[in-house]
């Protein structure tokens, strides 16, 4: 328990310390976010905001996790697999951001190219999990052998979480405010199940996210970019798979799941009927265009994430 707290505090401090000089560097190099023309009008004001803040978020997570795990004598293959997966997801996101910055428009990797990278990276923790758990998934105290479906489910969860987190990162402070309760639930379930390594890394993610909020709260000084969102989402999915709470991710990650479903429903509806269900997707843009302020949306989504995360922990205990 002490090491989990150490991991959180160390990551928080590191994120705050790394953030200031990195943002100054981004401003000096004119590393700016380009806003989609289809985005709500209010977002035009965000043009020129530095991006790739995920670099110092993930750096804080990796450094604090390694230090804490070494102090706790918990640095093992499981920890390395999680951190290596996080590193490569960060690289994929950074490549996407780099192409957008270089082209001075909001076009990075092609959707197919991005998905291929995510799938290949997701295979790392999937193969490790199969080596440890075979093809068995758990839900509380219950176990289910799903056979050949296991690797498909694992890859789907990790890539899905990565993309869902990315879709959620559309308002100042939204992704981190929604992500913190999700990582808290994942870490709590992992701790209760004896997966201390997963709990420690979850704590690092929470600490770094809290630190990043200082720079990303309205009006944001920096955006995490795909560097941060793809990596944090991929990390959440990876921790859920290795921490054996992959099914409960649908509950404690309910907000990012809803954001993703809103996009799927919007696109499907328009293709089939020519009509849109929402004013704009993802879901947070629908509320924006309905007259809700960014701050209100972030608070309400964060509250929803907290309630769902609490429900997931309770379900884990009761089932």
Place the predicted regions along the sequence by residue.
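Alpha-helical transmembrane segments
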Residues: 1-27, 57-95, 125, 129, ...
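N-terminal alpha-helical transmembrane segments of multi-pass membrane transport
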Residues: 22-27, 31-40
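Peri-membrane helix termini and adjoining interfacial loops of integral membrane proteins
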Residues: 30-36, 132-136, 277-281
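Juxtamembrane helix-capping/reentrant segments at transmembrane boundaries
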Residues: 36-50, 104-117, 284, 289
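Hydrophobic transmembrane alpha-helix segments characteristic of membrane transport
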Residues: 95-103
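Membrane interface segments of multi-pass transport proteins and intramembrane proteases
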Residues: 102-110, 137-146, 293
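Carboxylate/His-rich catalytic cores and anion/metal-binding grooves
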Residues: 116-124
């Amino acid at each position: 328990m002490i090491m989990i707290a150490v991991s959180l505090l160390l990551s928080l401090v590191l994120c705050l310390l790394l953030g200031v000089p990195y943002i100054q560097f981004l401003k000096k190099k004119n590393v700016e976010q380009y806003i989609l023309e289809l985005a709500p009008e209010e977002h035009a004001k965000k043009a020129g905001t530095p991006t790739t803040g995920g670099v110092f978020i993930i750096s804080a997570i990796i450094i604090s996790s390694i230090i804490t795990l070494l102090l706790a004598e918990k640095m093992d293959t499981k920890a390395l697999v999680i951190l290596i997966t996080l590193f490569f997801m960060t690289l994929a996101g950074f490549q996407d951001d780099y192409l957008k910055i270089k082209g001075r428009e909001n076009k990075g990797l092609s959707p197919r190219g991005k998905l291929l990278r995510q799938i290949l990276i997701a295979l790392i923790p999937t193969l490790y999990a199969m080596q440890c758990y075979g093809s068995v998934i758990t839900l509380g105290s219950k176990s289910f052998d799903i056979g050949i479906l296991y690797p498909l489910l694992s890859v789907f969860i990790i890539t899905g979480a990565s993309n869902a987190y990315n879709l959620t990162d559309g308002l100042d402070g939204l992704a981190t405010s929604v992500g913190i309760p999700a990582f808290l639930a994942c870490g709590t379930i992992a701790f209760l199940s004896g997966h201390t390594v997963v709990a420690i890394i979850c704590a690092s993610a929470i600490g770094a996210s809290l630190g990043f909020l200082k720079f990303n709260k309205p009006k944001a000084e920096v955006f995490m970019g795909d560097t941060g969102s793809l990596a944090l989402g991929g990390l959440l999915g990876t921790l859920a798979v290795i921490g054996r709470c992959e099914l409960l991710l649908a509950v404690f990650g309910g907000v990012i799941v809803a954001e993703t479903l809103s996009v799927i429903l919007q696109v499907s509806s328009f293709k089939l009927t020519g009509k849109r269900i929402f004013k704009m997707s993802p879901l947070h843009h629908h509320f924006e265009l309905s007259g809700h302020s960014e701050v209100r949306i972030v608070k309400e989504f964060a509250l929803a994430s907290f309630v769902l995360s609490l429900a997931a922990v309770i379900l884990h205990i009761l089932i």
